[in-house]
């Protein structure tokens, strides 16, 4: 469940936050872990709608809310950097420090039961989700840049030297 309000320690938001800052000149690079991990990333707003539909259903049950698509961390980073016209390979570094010891390589959800029984399916595409998050973080980075230029914010990230 991703959105522009996802915590900055989660990989999707770490990437989009870095893209926003890099594109405005206040960050030099981003360091990530396993670029080959695959996830089923969907928009939190779509999942909230799914939860509401679950609550309206006549009988309690369990349903999976997912997109039915999987994308790697590398794909997410590439799409995010492409959105601002940059090559992710120029800005992404990989460190073993960020590899999880018990990494699940591949996660994919099947929402067919939710579609059949409660009429739910995801509305936001992967491309739209990434673009939404990057656009939000570009706006935030522009505000951060003004604060940095006026000595009101000390960067705690990979700041260009």
Task: Report the location of each language-model feature.
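C-terminal substrate-binding subdomain of Rossmann-fold SDR/epimerase-dehydratase oxidoreductases
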Residues: 6-7, 11-161
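Conserved catalytic-site region of short-chain dehydrogenase/reductase
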Residues: 1-5
């Amino acid at each position: 469940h991703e959105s522009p309000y996802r915590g900055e320690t989660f990989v999707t938001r770490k990437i989009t936050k870095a893209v926003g800052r890099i594109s405005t000149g206040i960050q030099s690079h981003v360091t990530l872990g396993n670029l080959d991990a695959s996830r089923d990333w969907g928009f939190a707003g779509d999942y909230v709608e799914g939860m509401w539909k679950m609550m309206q259903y006549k009988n309690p049950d369990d349903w999976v809310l997912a997109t039915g698509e999987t994308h790697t961390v590398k794909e997410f980073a590439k799409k995010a950097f492409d959105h601002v016209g940059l090559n992710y390979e120029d800005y992404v570094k990989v460190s073993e420090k960020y590899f999880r010891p018990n990494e699940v390589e591949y996660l994919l959800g099947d929402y067919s039961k939710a579609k059949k029984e409660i009429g739910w399916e995801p509305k936001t595409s992967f491309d739209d989700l990434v673009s939404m998050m990057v656009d939000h973080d570009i706006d935030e980075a522009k505000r951060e840049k003004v604060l940095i230029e006026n000595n009101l914010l000390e960067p705690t990230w990979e700041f260009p030297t």
